[in-house]
Each structure stands twice: as structure tokens, then as C-alpha cells.
Amino acid sequence: MKLDIGGEETFEVPIETLWSALNDPAVLKKCIPGCKDMIPEGGDRFKLILNLKVASVGGSFEGEISLANQQPPAQCKVAVSGSGTLGQGSGSATFSLEQQPAATLMRYSGEGEIGGLVAGVGQRILKGVAKHLIKQFFTSLRREVTAAPPAQS
């Protein structure tokens, strides 16, 4: 089952602060919903261990996240793949950052492919779950970057 995501978020921090947070495994571990561990595997690749609940079914997932096509501090592509008790999935998203007068605008777009038991809950429910998880990520990221000291230029 295919899922498409996209949107934009505004963060009231300088672009460098947001870029640093998006490239900090400790911050990402706190922000990725259900993330239990994020283990460096070399370069810009990390092993992920997640516990997620989809509809009324919960399970654990193990996978990989990698960063590519980085153009600091403006753009990055993220690729994710994994499998677990509920099925398997993979996807990628591109994030672009643009400095605004008093904030940073983040635009994102991506797509994912989900299979296995989790795909059986239906596309409408999965889209709702995906939107909820994305909202959780951005809420946590906003909390992390606004609590952080300003980035040094």
C-alpha cells in the first residue's frame, strides 16, 4: 500500500538551529514517535528500533534511516526502511529549509510503501495514523529546537 506525505511547518528559530537538530541523532531519537533506539552505523546511516501502535494493533520494528543529498543548511533527503511484527515498510522524504524574517520554513514531501499485517487496516486509517505520527514528530521537534540554545554561526 502506497502512502504520500507532504506539507510545511514553520519553526521560530534560525535555519542553522533547525538544520543542526535534524542532523542530531539524540534529537531525532526524542522526536521520532516510538523510537526506542537510534544506533550509528557509519556515515549518515542509523539503525532504528521502534515500538508503534497502528489502529488497535501494536508492534516493534527494526530498520534503517539514512540521510543523503545534504545541502547544508537548506535540503536533505531521508530514506527509511524496516520490518517487524506488523509488517514492513520503506519510504523517503525530502526536507527543504528556507530562512524567513523571524523563522524557518520547512517544506517536506515523500512517499512510502507499507505491506504485511499493518496494510490490512486500510489506506484511510493508515493515512490518519501517518498524519498523527508526523504531527507528533513536528511537535517534539519544535519543543526540542525552541528549548535549545541558538546555533553558533
Please give the residue ranges for each predicted region.
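Hydrophobic/aromatic beta-strand elements that line small-molecule binding cavities or substrate pockets
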Residues: 7-9, 35-36, 62-69, 91-99
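Beta-strand/loop substructures that line and gate deep hydrophobic ligand-binding cavities in soluble
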Residues: 82-128
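A generic beta-sheet turn/junction motif
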Residues: 11, 52-56, 71, 84-86, ...
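Hydrophobic pocket/interface hotspot
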Residues: 18, 22, 28, 67, ...
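Hydrophobic ligand-binding cavity/cleft-lining segments
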Residues: 1-47, 51-53, 147-153
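Intrinsic-disorder/low-complexity, polar/charged segments enriched in Ser/Thr/Lys/Arg/Asp/Glu/Gln
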Residues: 2-8, 45-47, 60-62, 75, ...
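A conserved amphipathic terminal alpha-helix motif
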Residues: 118-153
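Glycine-rich portal/gate segments that line the openings of hydrophobic small-molecule binding cavities
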Residues: 39-81, 136
